[in-house]
Amino acid sequence: MAYGALTLVWVVLWRFPVLMADDRFFAIASELPRGQQTWAVIEKMFDDCWRLINGRLADGFGTMLFALGNTALRLAMALFYVALSAILWCYLRLSAEALRRPLPRLSLGTGSGAAWICWSLAAIWPFTLIGLSTGVAGESVMLMAAVWNYMFPLALLLFALYPLFRRWAGRPMPWWAELLSVPLVYVSFLMHELVTVAGAVLVAVALLTARSRVWTVPVGLITASAIVGVYVKFTAPGLRARTETYQGIDPVLLTSLRAKAVSAAMALNLWPQRDLKLLLVLALALGLAVHMAWRSGRFSTSRARLLLATLSLMFLSVLAWLVANMHFIREQRRVGTTDLDAINNLLGEAIPVLAAAGGFVVCTLVVVFLLPKGFLSPLTTGTLLAAFLTTGAVAYSSSPHYAWVHRTFYMPGILAVLVVVMICADVLSSAGEATRPETRTTSLLAPVLLVLVGLHSLVVTGTQLAANWAAWRNVEHQVAAVKAGQQDTVTIPITLPCSDVMWYFNGSNLERTAHQWRIYYGLDRDVPVRVRVPETVHSCPIQ
């Protein structure tokens, strides 16, 4: 029943999103109305994405999903989120069992409160992320292209690695189930380069931290599949082509060490700008873990002081990151954001940003490794490492042309919020062993607060999506009137009431936008489609 309710929520939400520019690129690939596709174009899209565009197998699924029809497409978007929440709940239980403090099963009886809170965290994490990350609702969570690029590959990866982690936890699945995961691991590693990085980290964690014998023939095949997947993914021709997109530009301006440092700082500036609350919540979650470990008497006073000092430095590094970011942006605006030569002279401003970000990472890892052994699950630590490594990968491969695009950090953002969820689950399972009632009460504070943040964001996001769809209905009525011969022109609004659930709605080329909508709605070429500021501008009902 719980998953039925969760599915219903996602199905209702996915009735409303209007296609963004990235979505429309795939929707009109076959130049047929309403996202219809030919098999030849689907095959070509897979081939082009792998060889020419970005080296991602995931993007090839865009046209395939549109070919299913609008209803099935939106149902698939909903089910991808439900699937990831379900597999996350399985990992939370598996992680607790590996630490010998299992979470109880979901039930309506007494003693299952902690389990329900953990399940709620796993179910509502996308909305918790929305509450902690500015603009991520429209830029990533409710953007179809982001769902099949990030959510689907991550859900597939976790599903494929589940037999390996069952063996890691000492509860191996049948050998045939482990063998079936071998091709799935390989395919998941080809989907998206950031998923590949995360997958490599998780496989290493499973192999290096297992308490019992883990090496078997199926595990060896899974490991080999992962290694081959990493090699094939990072030698994909499209991945290199993506870094060579900008023709006519001096390569030194993009690939020199100075350029890499400045571009990385530009990209990392997005964290204090857009994800400051997420950084602080991660630090607070670790602070709660330190407090709970100290209350349980599991480390000495000297270690407690060291942890407290490191936590303080962790918060100070976030503040330093924010200050360095403000200075960098001020100088960037002074020299002009489009002048690559001038931007590359901002090395002096970039170094403090990189140092502050690096300080936050180091302090976080020190806190994690100073905690008593077994307090946090190795899976939590591995996910944290994956979040940091994927962030580093995005920063390293960034270019001044798209360093401002927050969506590039969607995967690290997902992993970061999952780390927070896992820390809360570890704390709750640890509190189950505590004898003091106040200890158990303290362990509930952060998880319950995160659930409330998620519920609030769910209400806000749903209301904003519905408001945008209500405004977009006018376009649907215009299309119907044109096809009925009742009017000659279709006017597309240049924006919709609630910008928080929009990203790259029209793009920079309005003529291309009009062309895309003309194809999508199956309008004749001689029908004028204009992208304009609407005559009646509706305000967003909730912010």
Enumerate the predicted regions with their spans.
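Transmembrane alpha-helical segments
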Residues: L84-S95, P153-W168, A200-L208, L284-V290, ...
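Membrane-interface micro-motifs in multi-pass membrane enzymes
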Residues: A114-F165, G348-C363, F388-I423
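Short hydrophobic alpha-helices at membrane interfaces in multi-pass membrane enzymes
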Residues: R166-Y186, V214-G220
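Alpha-helical transmembrane segments
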Residues: M1-W10, L121-F127, L180-V182, G220-I227, ...
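Individual alpha-helical transmembrane segments in multi-pass integral membrane proteins
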Residues: D47, N70-I87, P126-I130, A146-A155, ...
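Transmembrane catalytic cores of multi-pass membrane glycosyltransferases
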Residues: V11-L75, M144, E193-R407
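Intrinsically disordered, polar/acidic, low-complexity terminal segments
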Residues: A2-L57, T63, A67-W119, R213-G220, ...
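C-terminal structural cap/anchor segments
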Residues: L370-S377, A395-Q464
